[in-house]
């Protein structure tokens, strides 16, 4: 397939640090190396923010309740997060990127897209640039990174997962469509468990199956996302690497295998969603003022509840507001199928003496 619109193929790299938070902790504390490690709180209501590869071997994952993680891996070691350290290391990594290009789109502290079609060192091979970047990151930080190289962002992201940890993978324009066709849809970036399950119920299990469906079929079943699925099934992604991409909100949601009808279970499911959103906020050094709760019931009716405060909130306020919003809809007459929480009205972190929760009247 010829790259988008007949243009010369772009050269996009997706760099993803390997188990970033956990790797920083193992780097700084030799006693933790080679051991199953979770960054997060070990308390009964704690949540795993990140897991080392040793912990992942036991099934421990980020956003997992700490009690569940400990059950899966009794020898799991918990350490509290040090976001100031992670941000400092991320700045070092960003400096390495800047040696090659200004077109850097950070996704979080530990991953970013780079467009190296034109680059500072005039190196024609994106594969070579990725190797140089990974080697320099290791030299500067003592940490390993993986990379995906391709001609668009979707494929570069998918490629970076292929040779983790400490590896890289290339998807060329010639091989892009075939790569997508063989990939299970539940491995597609941006296709969550609920969407993958819906696709599989429609007989769509691979990229090839997805490609067989018409645009109208996909839009009928997936709404506005149908066009996106139609394009990525054909290895098409025309999104530019955007260094100035504004983030208007940060959210997380989950669809449940069985409908939830009680408040206690709903609050337990809300906790890791709040933790996931907060982890991103900590990583970016930002806060928000508006908390929005989203609920989709078993009959697909959807409701939202929101609350805005005068100044950017801290984690305890976020947890409290989200729980209050959830409690306000109970008791419910029908089961909850999906739960989501979003933080918006984003801004930089305020000085500590200004972080008092003041509700708007």
Curated annotation (Swiss-Prot):
Belongs to the DNA polymerase type-Y family. Its cofactor is Mg(2+). Binds 2 magnesium ions per subunit. It catalyses: DNA(n) + a 2'-deoxyribonucleoside 5'-triphosphate = DNA(n+1) + diphosphate. GO terms for molecular function: damaged DNA binding; DNA-directed DNA polymerase activity; magnesium ion binding. Pfam families: IMS (PF00817), IMS_C (PF11799), IMS_HHH (PF11798). This is DNA polymerase IV 3. Residues 12-192 form the UmuC domain. The gene is dinB3. SUPFAM superfamilies: DNA/RNA polymerases, Lesion bypass DNA polymerase (Y-family), little finger domain. Its EC number is 2.7.7.7. GO terms for cellular component: cytosol. Keywords: Cytoplasm, DNA damage, DNA repair, DNA replication, DNA-binding, DNA-directed DNA polymerase, Magnesium, Metal-binding, Mutator protein, Nucleotidyltransferase, Plasmid, Transferase. It is an enzyme of class 2 (transferase). Poorly processive, error-prone DNA polymerase involved in untargeted mutagenesis. Copies undamaged DNA at stalled replication forks, which arise in vivo from mismatched or misaligned primer ends. These misaligned primers can be extended by PolIV. Exhibits no 3'-5' exonuclease (proofreading) activity. May be involved in translesional synthesis, in conjunction with the beta clamp from PolIII. The keyword DNA repair applies. The record marks 21 as: Substrate discrimination. InterPro entries: DNA/RNA_pol_sf, DNA_pol_Y-fam_lit_finger_sf, DNA_pol_Y-fam_little_finger, DNA_polymerase-Y, DNApol_IV, PolY_HhH_motif, Rev_trsase/Diguanyl_cyclase, UmuC.
């Amino acid at each position: 397939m010829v790259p988008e619109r007949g243009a010369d193929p772009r050269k996009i790299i997706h760099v993803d640090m390997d188990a970033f938070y956990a790797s920083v902790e193992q780097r700084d504390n030799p006693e933790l190396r080679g051991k199953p490690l979770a960054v997060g709180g070990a308390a009964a209501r704690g949540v795993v923010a990140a897991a080392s590869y040793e912990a992942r071997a036991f099934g421990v994952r980020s956003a997992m309740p700490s009690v569940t993680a400990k059950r899966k891996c009794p020898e799991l070691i918990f350490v509290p997060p040090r976001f100031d350290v992670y941000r400092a290391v991320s700045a070092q990594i960003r400096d390495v990127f800047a040696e090659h290009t200004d077109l850097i789109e950070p996704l979080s502290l530990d991953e970013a897209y780079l467009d190296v079609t034109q680059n500072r060192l005039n190196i024609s091979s994106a594969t070579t640039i990725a190797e140089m970047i990974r080697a320099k990151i290791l030299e500067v930080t003592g940490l390993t990174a993986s990379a995906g190289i391709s001609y668009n962002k979707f494929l570069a992201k998918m490629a970076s997962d292929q040779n983790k940890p400490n590896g890289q993978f290339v998807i060329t324009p010639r091989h892009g469509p075939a790569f997508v066709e063989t990939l299970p849809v539940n491995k597609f970036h941006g296709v969550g468990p609920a969407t993958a399950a819906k696709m599989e119920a429609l007989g769509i299990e691979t990229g090839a199956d997805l490609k067989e469906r018409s645009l109208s079929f996909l839009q009928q079943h997936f709404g506005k996302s149908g066009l996106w699925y139609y394009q990525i099934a054909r290895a098409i992604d025309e999104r530019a690497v955007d260094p100035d991409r504004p983030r208007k909100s940060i959210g997380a949601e989950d669809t449940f295998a069985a409908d939830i009808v009680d408040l206690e279970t709903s609050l337990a499911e809300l906790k890791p969603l709040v933790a996931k959103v907060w982890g991103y906020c900590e990583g970016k050094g930002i806060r928000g003022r508006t908390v929005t709760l989203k609920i989709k019931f078993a009959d697909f009716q959807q409701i939202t509840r929101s609350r805005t405060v005068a100044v950017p909130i801290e984690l305890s306020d976020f947890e409290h507001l989200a729980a209050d919003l959830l409690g306000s809809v109970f008791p419910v007459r029908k089961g909850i199928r999906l739960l989501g929480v979003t933080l918006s009205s984003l801004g930089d972190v305020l000085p500590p003496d200004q972080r008092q929760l003041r509700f708007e009247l």
